[in-house]
Amino acid sequence: MSSPPGAYWRAQRLAEVGRYAEAERTARAGLAEAPGDGWLLTLLASVLRLQRDYAGALAGADAAVAATPLLADAHLERAENLIALIRSREAVGAATEAVRLEPEVASGHFVLARALAAGRDFERARAAAAHGRTLDPQSVEGLLTVADVERDAGNREAARVAARAALAVAPDNPYGRWLVAMLDAERLKVRRSMRALREVARDNPGRADLVSMTWPIRGVLSGLRRGLAVSAGLVCALLLVAHWWWAPAGTFARVVAAVLAAVMAGFAARVLIPAGRLPWRCLRLLPSLMRRAGTAGLALTGAAIGLLVAYAATAWWPLPVIALAAAPLLWLLSLAELLGAGLDDPGSREALRSWAGDLRD
């Protein structure tokens, strides 16, 4: 197989320092002279993926595979794009072919592990990552792959250990730092998580993850949605008991409403106060639908908790019923928020388009 041309190395150096637009122009200029060069097509696909043009990147990877079917890097790049496009089964196939072509290269096993994890096949994903690490025990990519697989599988402590090990080798790795910050977020280490996310965004301004930096707001909303449904439902159940069987349950319902409202307010304060102003600043920069759904969810949740407090003070029975009726609306707003995030994310957007095309066919 031929070696990469000079344009490949020039474009790769530009991509390594984050100058993706220049790298893309250099790769395209090289392809103008050698249209079927698999190395350049693979690199172009990689640069487009880093710029979140997943549809264009996949087209480039497909062209690279067609031009040089024995080039393992082309199959790996195709697998990476298929993972981003939420097409895990095809991603596993592409990564498996890359591993077949170059079984001694560790990165192929790591991509295969991520593809398997995307398809929720965690046992095989762990095996693939472990095999890759036997080939390159000090690989930062390998350690971060282990962290990704374990996080997807719900094993946060194992994920944290692997991510920390990766940062011990490469302290400035932006993805490793981001991953540790998000693992801290899942453990409600609010200040530490937000500080780390702020530092990652400062050091990599072109790839700041605004959605991640709003996790305190979104996490509070997620917790309060569940808490409100349970709390209002319990109070309404006690009201029914008081009406039909045991009158003192009405007094107990007021106490429960007050206590649960205080617990939910305390949880919100526990997360939002240490987070500071950064999540609110980032909220304004989110996609329109996601921002509006989140803002409406906050307002509706606050109003519903206020209804529980008002019921505890007045004993007027319609108040908890109205609060309970707000729960389905909150879940609808949650779906709208997810849809807004998906429409902004090129991978999710292309997956939705592909799904719609399948329906039409």
Question: What is each PLM-predicted segment?
Answer:
Residues S2-I217:
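Alpha-helical protein-protein interaction scaffolds
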Residues L224-L278:
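Core alpha-helical transmembrane segments of integral membrane proteins
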Residues G219, P248-A258, R284-R291, P318-L319:
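Membrane-interfacial entry segments at the cytosolic side of transmembrane helices
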Residues D203, D209-R225, A268-R291, L335-W355:
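Cytoplasmic membrane-interface segments at the C-terminal ends of transmembrane helices
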Residues L188-M194, P216-A237:
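Alpha-helical linker/edge segments of TPR/alpha-solenoid repeat scaffolds
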Residues L285-D361:
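Generic detector of multi-pass transmembrane helix bundles and their immediately adjacent loops
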Residues E150, D184, R192-A196, A208-D209, ...:
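Alpha-helical transmembrane segments and immediately adjacent membrane-interfacial amphipathic helices
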Residues L40-L44, L224, S231-V235, L260, ...:
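Cleavable Sec-type N-terminal signal peptides
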